[in-house]
Amino acid sequence: MTNKIIIPTTGDKITFIDGKLSVPNNPIIPYIEGDGIGVDVTPPMLKVVNAAVAKAYGGDRKIEWLEVYAGEKATKMYDSETWLPEETLNILQEYKVSIKGPLTTPVGGGMSSLNVAIRQMLDLYVCQRPVQWFTGVPSPVKRPSEVDMVIFRENTEDIYAGIEYKAGSDKAKSVIKFLIEEMGASNIRFTENCGIGIKPVSKEGSQRLVRQAIQYAIDNNKDSVTLVHKGNIMKFTEGAFKDWGYELAIEEFGASLLHGGPWCSLKNPNTGKEIIIKDVIADAMLQQVLLRPAEYSVIATLNLNGDYLSDALAAQVGGIGIAPGANLGDEVAVFEATHGTAPKYAGKNKVNPGSVILSAEMMLRHMGWLEADLLLKGMSGAIQAKTVTYDFERLMDDATLVSCSAFGDCIIDHM
């Protein structure tokens, strides 16, 4: 395959030394523009980040952007069958920190999702989704300000592993036959036309996710970590996730049982504050985040539950149009727009770029460039001034409608 990616002649790589990121003053950061509305939201993101870094650091720090390709743009740059070039994956791995727009799902065989493929191929096992409300953002709930949570969603296992077989296929029939004849399964109905999926959940995968969630709670002085699961039904996968989570809290963080367990607590070694480790059944949690959101701060959960919870919570604070996200491994991090490609709006300079801009703010914090929280100040100022894109303008009184790119400019003006 011909190399298509052009490395900047200036700038240095972010490296990982002794367990920590080492970020130069002029880091090279790869980005994927994205499909559909990626062409609309990514350019304002780059402009806003550059402005925030310049305002925070003058000329002392600067990002050197490196475009890499995935999705539809990759099929045009390479060939029609290449949706996720090996060259792109290698650079995301090598340069440690990157950001991407939304990617479409290829039609037909092969990978089921480019987003999932990137997470699995780079072992980005944490999907981190902070959910908080900006003053002035239209919300369907009465007290959106009570929503302030960070979701840690396991990113590589569960049914998203993609191990499933089409109804009526030879593979599905073989699996069904094995389950019935070898494993004694007796409750598979309609065996001739039954799709089959596998739900892998490992102790190692569960505990490394919970470890990151508890460490985040310690580092950010949070009150609790909630293990969300459906263990009352799926005892050996979802239930095991819960049990392994408690086990890790006790064995690695020194947590003590509360009232005989399974809830437990540990003392924050930095502040002395008590952190409660608790669990909630997934369907009950979907009620709790509506009725009692203030009782939850850090959530650790498996892949599917995390998908549901992330979008449900985002709806309470303005929708996924401004919901940021990060995919994190032990060394590599890929930040992303959490919404889809919305092809009917592509190229119309209309949609809200907030998701990928706020993901960029997460990226800067991950790099240790904390002064660049000017992004948050700018976003909040633009929203409170009611100079907003159509998704907010239609729900606000006396708001001024602006384009996608103009909203980015408004964020810069309010830094």
UniProtKB/Swiss-Prot annotation:
It comes from the Bacteria. D-threo-isocitrate binds at S113, N115, R119, R129, R153. InterPro entries: IsoCit/isopropylmalate_DH_CS, Isocitrate_DH_NADP_dimer_prok, IsoPropMal-DH-like_dom. SMART domains: Iso_dh (SM01329). Its EC number is 1.1.1.42. It is an enzyme of class 1 (oxidoreductase). The record marks Y160, K230 as: Critical for catalysis. Mg(2+) binds at D307. One of its GO terms (biological process) is tricarboxylic acid cycle. NCBIfam families: PRK07006.1, prok_nadp_idh. Homodimer. Belongs to the isocitrate and isopropylmalate dehydrogenases family. This is Isocitrate dehydrogenase [NADP] 1. It comes from Colwellia maris. The gene is icdI.
